[in-house]
């Protein structure tokens, strides 16, 4: 378990010891395991201390598991909850959180790092990792696909690797595996919290972790130690009873739930599973369920701590994490909901009654039981012939998945059957690949005709070069164990219908050319004319001989230190990478005379807004990737895809946006429900912003995309009355009323759009927003990154500094003072938002918890802290002022108001009097 370092303080001229601000009981509990420290173990002592503070402000409140983990990661529980009613938290209160780590995949890491590099910091402030999985094409097999992809993406991989080295980020190279499988195997831990620049980051919920998909700007928040803001989600409780049997798998649980909730049903919620049925699920099975929670719009999903989680941790060489998790759960019931905890909605599912499902096409929530799939094919006139079967993706590429698949395949091969269609299999990681190869699974799959692809995303993210004769635009059906099936997503063909199902259903159906074949009941004819029926498959949860690492060169250093002198170059002539220019700050006042660039009809996912596939290569070049903006969107007026008009002249949507940017014409987009559904890709927000888009107006947003828009300085608005969607059209002129008040911090009034039609008539459309006070600051600054950069350059990120650090100080220190982060220089004054007990005005305090110490000429980095004998840093206590605490209250009319309570908050004001190298 991690050693819990404490700040050492001594009073000048006094022998009085100052206790750490924390919970001493918790500290005592965990000292016994400190010798087995692991940097991936959550800081349980700190988390329990935060949770105990939370319970003081929410006395008697029964907490769900999700709330426990979120609240234990609050920056300041007192600031968040003092004077707040429990009923005003979920769905209303913005939480400021400190995640434990960040993970980034290679497509999104490019933009995240380009943004981080502008902040001027020498290292990431929390552990971070980069995973090269999105840029590898699935074609002929791993042995040729990996070298080809490395050659084609050398510039990007070199950039990511050098940036990782410079800033102390772990780098998992191409072929190492899919980000979420590697996170599950190495970083996920019960009760921890992480952010990932991919929408399927919630996969780690299978290990009891709060793991949330975000855009790159949110990752920059975490990497710069800026508290990450999240509106407190509501909680959907899923009560599981019974146990699965036969052909039913964990994939069928989430496919069934997607059918019930729809793609919007989880928006603004965390899905928390509980009940006796949980114990019957494997850890990787629970990860599958959490992974696809993204498909219903959920913020994340989580399971309580179980024996299968402990077994998985031990099997993946993290016994110390398992021991620490078991201990904290035993002592504090941290990793399960409190008895009597309330949920905003409860869904009961009897696992014994579940049957296999197939979801699709073109949306992951159209769920059909396998027994009724044949009828659905006839009714909807879907293709009757299967064209390919694909197994893998971050959702279903575990060891257990592979053993289930090979059992099905061996049954068919033993009966003399052969696959009727191309059959592709993707292991989730190098560890999975090496282990299934050792155990003979790979050989048996290849003997059956399977093509084993690289340990990467491949076809799931559109990086699939098909080897069959399906022509572009030809209707065809594929079966996959993937998580998402939007039009054109997998192979670029808008007529390819992807039906999502479990790996075992895919494996069985490839032995029939009939898409309607039901392996749970139907039979196939063998070459000798006999009827063959599959028996229910049997898999193995964990390898009996243990996992093996495979190629150890993929494994990065456990805790890499930054190498500041590393050169990270961007060729100005490159068409793959482009340095970022800051967006202009908002100039104030109302927006006047915007024009509607396009009014979108129907589903508009991030795949429609910023397609992947062949466009992935431009993820690091904003100007180039802007050329795919909304190319999948349907024009509501004409029914055309990727078509817009300017005074009757037709052009592509990006062409119009570039034209209007050149003309100085700001614009907006109008769309329908769940705009931005799907991937976490922030390019879908960056691109409109870069081309002078200022407002996106919809019936509703997907959570991640709405946040990404706010981060980039684009104002997301929704209709107060959805019927008003019909009152606004492409090329209408739009001005705002109410933004001036918003900029002043007035949050509770709508913004009105004054729309001037082509015939000169005027209509007013009231709109809602969900901007917080911090998000308004992003908007005013031009983007969240502009604000972070400004704070970083002033010497501190998101902490109260009364006097900013001096320009170019002789020496500075990166200090942690009672878990609050400051970059300090001699003469600075600092405010700690609590009373520092045991000291008096005039006392001198020595600061020893220093992450780095440096000057204009050098920097010393600690591991995690610099040896205190190398420097002297002292601060004198100036005063203990009190400031009124402003809290949110509700009046009878249910309007929100800010009111100053009689309660006072005491601060400790320090001045840094000495800061020198010994």
UniProtKB/Swiss-Prot annotation:
InterPro entries: Acnase/IPM_dHydase_lsu_aba_1/3 (IPR015931), Acoase/IPM_deHydtase_lsu_aba (IPR001030), Aconitase/3IPM_dehydase_swvl (IPR015928), Aconitase/IPM_isomerase (IPR050926), Aconitase_4Fe-4S_BS (IPR018136), Aconitase_4Fe-4S_dom (IPR036008), Aconitase_dom2 (IPR015932), Aconitase_mito-like (IPR006248). One of its GO terms (biological process) is lysine biosynthetic process via aminoadipic acid. Disulfide bonds: none annotated. It catalyses: (2R)-homocitrate = cis-homoaconitate + H2O. [4Fe-4S] cluster binds at residues 394, 457, 460. One of its GO terms (molecular function) is metal ion binding. Pfam families: Aconitase (PF00330), Aconitase_C (PF00694), Ribosomal_L21p (PF00829). Coiled coil: none annotated. Residues 1-30 form a transit peptide. GO terms for cellular component: cytoplasm; cytosol; mitochondrial large ribosomal subunit; mitochondrion; nucleus. The keyword Mitochondrion applies. Keywords: 4Fe-4S, Amino-acid biosynthesis, Iron, Iron-sulfur, Lyase, Lysine biosynthesis, Metal-binding, Mitochondrion, Nucleus, Transit peptide. Its cofactor is [4Fe-4S] cluster. Residues 31-811 are annotated as: Homocitrate dehydratase, mitochondrial. PANTHER family: ACONITATE HYDRATASE B, HOMOCITRATE DEHYDRATASE, MITOCHONDRIAL. In the N-terminal section; belongs to the aconitase/IPM isomerase family. In the C-terminal section; belongs to the bacterial ribosomal protein bL21 family. There seems to be no cleavage of the fusion protein, the ribosomal bL21m domain may not exist as a single domain form. Catalyzes the reversible dehydration of (R)-homocitrate to cis-homoaconitate, a step in the alpha-aminoadipate pathway for lysine biosynthesis. This is Aconitase-ribosomal protein bL21m fusion protein. The gene is aco2.
């Amino acid at each position: 378990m991690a050693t819990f370092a404490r700040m050492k303080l001594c009073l000048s001229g006094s022998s009085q010891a100052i206790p750490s601000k924390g919970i001493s009981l918790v500290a005592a509990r965990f000292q016994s395991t400190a010798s087995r420290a692991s940097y991936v173990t959550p800081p349980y002592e700190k988390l329990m201390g935060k949770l105990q503070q939370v319970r003081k402000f929410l006395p008697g409140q029964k907490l769900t598991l999700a709330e426990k983990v979120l609240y234990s990661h609050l920056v300041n529980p007192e600031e968040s909850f003092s004077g707040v009613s429990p009923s005003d938290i979920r769905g209303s209160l913005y939480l400021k959180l400190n995640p434990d780590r960040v993970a980034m995949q290679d497509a999104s890491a490019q933009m995240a790092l380009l943004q981080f590099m502008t902040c001027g910091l020498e290292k990431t402030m929390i552990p971070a990792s980069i995973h090269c999985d999105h840029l590898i094409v699935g074609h002929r097999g791993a042995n040729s696909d990996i070298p080809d992809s490395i050659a084609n993406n050398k510039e990007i991989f070199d950039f990511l690797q050098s940036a990782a080295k410079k800033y102390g980020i772990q780098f998992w190279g191409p072929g190492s595996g899919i980000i979420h499988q590697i996170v599950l195997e190495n970083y996920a831990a019960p009760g921890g919290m992480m952010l990932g620049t991919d929408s399927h980051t919630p996969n780690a919920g299978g290990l009891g972790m709060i793991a949330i998909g975000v855009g790159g700007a949110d990752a920059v928040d975490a990497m710069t130690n800026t508290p990450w803001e999240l509106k407190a989600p509501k909680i959907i409780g899923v009560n599981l009873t019974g146990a699965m049997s036969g052909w039913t798998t964990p994939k069928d649980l989430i496919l069934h739930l997607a059918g019930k909730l729809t793609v919007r049903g989880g928006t603004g919620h965390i899905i928390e599973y509980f009940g006796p049925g949980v114990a019957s699920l494997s850890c990787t099975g629970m990860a599958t369920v959490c992974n696809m929670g993204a498909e219903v719009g959920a913020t994340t999903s989580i399971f309580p701590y179980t024996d299968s989680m402990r077994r998985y941790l031990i099997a993946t060489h993290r016994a110390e994490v398992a021991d620490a998790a078991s201990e904290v759960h035993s002592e504090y019931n941290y990793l399960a909901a409190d008895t009597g905890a309330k949920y905003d909605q409860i869904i009961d599912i009897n696992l014994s009654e579940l049957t296999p499902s197939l979801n699709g096409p073109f949306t992951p929530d159209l769920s059909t039981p396998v027994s009724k799939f044949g009828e659905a094919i006839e009714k909807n006139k879907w293709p009757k012939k299967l064209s390919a079967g694909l197994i893998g993706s971050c959702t279903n590429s575990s060891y257990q998945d592979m053993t289930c698949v090979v059992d099905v395949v061996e049954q068919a091969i033993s009966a003399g059957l052969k696959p009727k269609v191309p059959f592709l299999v993707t292991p989730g990681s190098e560890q999975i690949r090496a282990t299934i190869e050792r155990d003979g699974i790979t050989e048996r799959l290849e003997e059956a005709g399977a093509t084993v692809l690289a340990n990467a995303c491949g076809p799931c993210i559109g990086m699939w070069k098909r080897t069959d004769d399906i022509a572009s635009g030809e209707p065809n059906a594929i079966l996959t164990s993937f998580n998402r099936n939007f039009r054109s997503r997998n192979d670029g063909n808008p007529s390819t219908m992807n039906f999502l199902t479990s790996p075992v259903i895919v494996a069985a159906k490839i032995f029939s050319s009939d898409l309607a074949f039901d392996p749970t009941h139907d039979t196939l004819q063998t070459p000798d004319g006999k009827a063959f029926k599959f028996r229910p498959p049997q898999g193995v949860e964990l390898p009996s001989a243990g996992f093996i690492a495979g190629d150890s060169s993929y494994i990065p250093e456990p805790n890499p230190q930054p190498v500041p002198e590393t050169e990270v170059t961007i060729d100005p002539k490159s068409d793959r990478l482009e340095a970022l220019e800051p967006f202009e700050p908002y100039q104030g006042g109302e927006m006047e005379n915007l024009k509607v660039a396009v009014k979108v009809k129907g589903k508009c996912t991030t795949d429609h807004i910023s397609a992947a596939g062949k466009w992935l290569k431009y993820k690091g070049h904003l100007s180039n990737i802007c050329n795919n903006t909304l190319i999948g969107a349907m024009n509501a007026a004409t029914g055309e895809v990727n078509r817009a008009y300017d005074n009757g002249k037709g052009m592509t949507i990006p062409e119009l946006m570039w034209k209007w940017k050149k003309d100085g014409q700001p614009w907006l987009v109008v769309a329908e429900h769940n705009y931005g559904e799907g991937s976490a890709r922030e390019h879908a927000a960056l691109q409109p912003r870069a081309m002078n888009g200022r407002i996106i107006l919809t019936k509703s947003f997907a959570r991640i995309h709405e946040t990404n828009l706010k981060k980039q300085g684009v104002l997301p608005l929704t209709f107060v009355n959805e019927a008003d969607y019909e009152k606004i059209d492409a090329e209408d002129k739009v001005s705002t009323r109410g933004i001036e008040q918003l900029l002043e911090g007035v949050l509770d009034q709508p913004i009105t759009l004054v729309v001037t039609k082509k015939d000169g008539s005027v209509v007013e459309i009231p709109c809602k927003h969900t901007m917080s006070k911090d998000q308004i600051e992003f908007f005013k600054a031009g983007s969240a990154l502009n604000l972070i950069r400004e704070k970083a350059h002033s010497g501190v990120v998101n902490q109260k500094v009364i006097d900013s650090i001096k320009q170019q100080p002789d020496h500075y220190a990166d200090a942690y003072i009672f878990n609050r982060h400051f970059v300090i220089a001699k003469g600075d004054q600092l405010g700690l938002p609590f009373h520092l007990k045991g000291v008096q005005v005039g006392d001198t305090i020595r600061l020893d918890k220093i992450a780095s110490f440096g000057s204009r000429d050098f920097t010393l980095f600690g591991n995690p802290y610099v040896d205190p004998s190398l420097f002297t840093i002292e601060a004198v206590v100036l005063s203990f002022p009190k400031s009124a605490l402003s809290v949110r209250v509700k009046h009878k009319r249910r309007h929100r108001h800010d009111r100053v309570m009689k309660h006072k908050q005491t601060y400790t004001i320090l001045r840094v009097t000495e800061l020198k190298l010994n």
